[in-house]
Structures are given as C-alpha cells and as structure tokens.
C-alpha cells in the first residue's frame, strides 16, 4: 500500500543499502493546520499561558515516549484479571496506577480475542495515544492508511502480514481529538512461564495499534 513502508533492520553494522528518496521537511507544503497550530501557540505564549520554553519541553517529553509504557499496561492485564477490567474501563486511570501520565484526553482500550480483531485509525489526521505507545509511525499518518483502513481493513491488515480468518470480526476504531484508542493484543501462546517484565518486552507498537498480532513462542 502506498504510504506503508516495511523496514525491518537496524543501521548499526548494517550492510550498504538504499532508501527511497524522502522530501526535505522544508519542501513539504505549509498546511492550514500548521498555520493554525503556529498561530494558536504564538497567541498563548503572548498571553503568557505558557512560555516558549515550556512548550518546547512538553514537545520533548512527548517525543521521548516509547511503546514501553503501553507494554507495561498490556503485560499487567495479561496476568491480573482485576487490572484488565480496570484497563478496559478507564485506560487513563489504569495508567496512573503505574505513575504513567496518559494525558488529559480519554483513552479507550479494546481487546483482541479469538473472535474479534481490533484496529485503530484516525481518519482526519493522526490522533493517537502518544504518551503510551510513542510517536505515530509515518504510515499511520498517511492518507492511504487513513482512508483504506475504514473501507477495506482486511486488505490493509494483509499488507502488514496479518491474515484475519473469515470467521473473525474486524472492528475499526476511529480515534478523534476527544477520544483515543489502544488495542489489548492477545497474549502469545507459549509465554505462560514468562514473568510480567518479560511479557512487557513482547508487546509492540503495531500490536497496540492492531495492524499486527504478537507471534506465538
């Protein structure tokens, strides 16, 4: 699918390889949303709601987040049924039990089962629980993913290598500015002897978006 890139290797010690040409950020059009964001930020700084330094520090905090926080919540839900119920009821409150700040926007957790597979999209822009699973990947923000996932989710999932059987219901959840989603993936078979810390390391960003399943061990 246009906009979805598969890149499975690291760069340290990797053999020479080519990347598709990417436009410089300066070459991208300055959109209305960008202009509005800059205008609002400038106005709030001018009115001393916050300083430019405070804004920069908050952006740095958000940019530093990784899927590890979400992985901790998933792992605890796998081993603690009571916590799982709390997570499915209120993600933000459940995250606070780990001293994890999930932000002010409500987040809803949807559970994958043998009969239901959930996948997350934001059809308007790139709304996403960044404080729990890190920055959204480029493909999540792409027009192709945003438009096609609603119309043909099975085809999109197949392009990620995720085959969903005909008897399994696929539910697509559209994140908005007022409500975000994260997926509770199924626990991999063969992980029964792993402790909670080891389980958390199995959880991936893409599994919490719902485009992939965790591989059995």
Roles of regions detected by a PLM:
Residues 2-217:
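Terminal, compositionally biased segments used for targeting/anchoring and flexible tails
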């Amino acid at each position: 699918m246009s906009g979805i890139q598969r890149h499975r290797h690291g760069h340290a010690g990797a053999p020479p390889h080519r990347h598709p040409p990417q436009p410089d950020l300066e070459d991208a059009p300055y959109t209305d949303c960008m202009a509005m964001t800059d205008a609002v930020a400038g106005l709030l700084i001018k009115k001393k709601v916050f300083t430019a330094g405070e804004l920069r520090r908050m952006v740095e905090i958000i940019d530093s987040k990784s899927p590890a926080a979400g992985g901790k919540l998933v792992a605890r839900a796998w081993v603690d049924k009571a916590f799982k119920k709390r997570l499915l009821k209120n993600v933000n409150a459940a995250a606070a039990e780990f001293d994890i700040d999930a932000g002010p926007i409500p987040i809803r957790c949807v559970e994958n089962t043998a009969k239901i597979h959930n996948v997350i999209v934001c059809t308007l822009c790139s709304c996403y629980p960044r404080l729990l699973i890190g920055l959204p990947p480029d493909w999540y923000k792409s027009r192709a993913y945003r438009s096609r996932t609603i119309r043909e989710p099975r085809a999109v999932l197949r392009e990620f290598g995720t085959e969903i059987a005909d008897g399994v219901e696929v539910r697509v959840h559209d994140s908005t500015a007022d409500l975000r989603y994260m997926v509770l993936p199924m626990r991999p078979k063969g992980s029964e002897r792993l402790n909670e810390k080891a389980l958390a390391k199995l959880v991936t960003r893409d599994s919490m978006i719902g485009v992939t399943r965790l591989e059995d061990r």
